[in-house]
Amino acid sequence: MAGMKEIRGKIKSVQNTRKITKAMEMVAASKMRRAQERMRAARPYAEKVRAIAAHMSRANPEYRHPFMVANDGVKTAGMILVTTDKGLCGGLNTNVLRASLQKFKELEEQGQKVEATAIGGKGLGFLNRFGAKVISQVVHLGDTPHLDKLIGAVKTQLDLYSEGKLSAVYLAYTRFVNTMKQETVIEQLLPLSSEHFDANDGTPATSWDYIYEPDAQAVVDELLVRYVEALVYQAVAENMASEQSARMVAMKAASDNAKTVISELQLSYNKSRQAAITKELSEIVGGAAAV
């Protein structure tokens, strides 16, 4: 009977755990839809800024912004690492951290030091344990990322590159593909390559141009900063959508596993109960036969 009592306790414990994971699955599903909406809403802004910057670059080929110039000979690179603040989202953070660690090693083999910016508590903890140099950080973004919270940390990297102190700036995050699939991405943020502006932006390479106030150079300077900030914001939005998707899938798997465990425990309980009843009947029959 002690075994049956222990099994009943385990069943109750797993049932309570399943209630929690089921609730977390439903919450993650709701947050995932909102995160996807924010992610999709951010894309047109970044694309429009890119299109305007592409037009201005063609119209003013003599001007090269520092973001578009390679800092050759510099032995330090920058890395913006985007992770989540919370766990329970499967291998999402593990994958991007593993890829980032590999990138760190590649840069070190090339004689490059790395100065990192952490967006998200998991990445910050990883960088501190790894012994990386963290020059700026943003944590506790919540479920809704705001650009004003990101600008300060990102600007640290942009300023260092503009001053010629970084050879390149890389951006590591998780790209949202669909609910069941997310991709780890490490891409070069700076210097901006011609590929950023060569894509068809819907504007013809014509002889006409806008009138810029105060002047074209000032507009380009401001526009490219906004463009890079938009790329980082888009990465954070993609990462948050990936986080909620991964958490929903992980919690669903946990709920399904809990259901399986409950069934197995219930079967063990029934076997123990049947064995106890059989034993009692045997004792009764044995006692009657003795009489």
Curated annotation (Swiss-Prot):
GO terms for biological process: proton motive force-driven plasma membrane ATP synthesis. SUPFAM superfamilies: ATP synthase (F1-ATPase), gamma subunit (SSF52943). The keyword Cell inner membrane applies. CDD domains: F1-ATPase_gamma. Gene3D superfamilies: 3.40.1380.10, ATP synthase, gamma subunit, helix hairpin domain. It comes from the Bacteria. It is a peripheral membrane protein. Keywords: ATP synthesis, Cell inner membrane, Cell membrane, CF(1), Hydrogen ion transport, Ion transport, Membrane, Transport. The keyword Cell inner membrane applies. This is ATP synthase gamma chain. It comes from Burkholderia mallei (strain ATCC 23344).
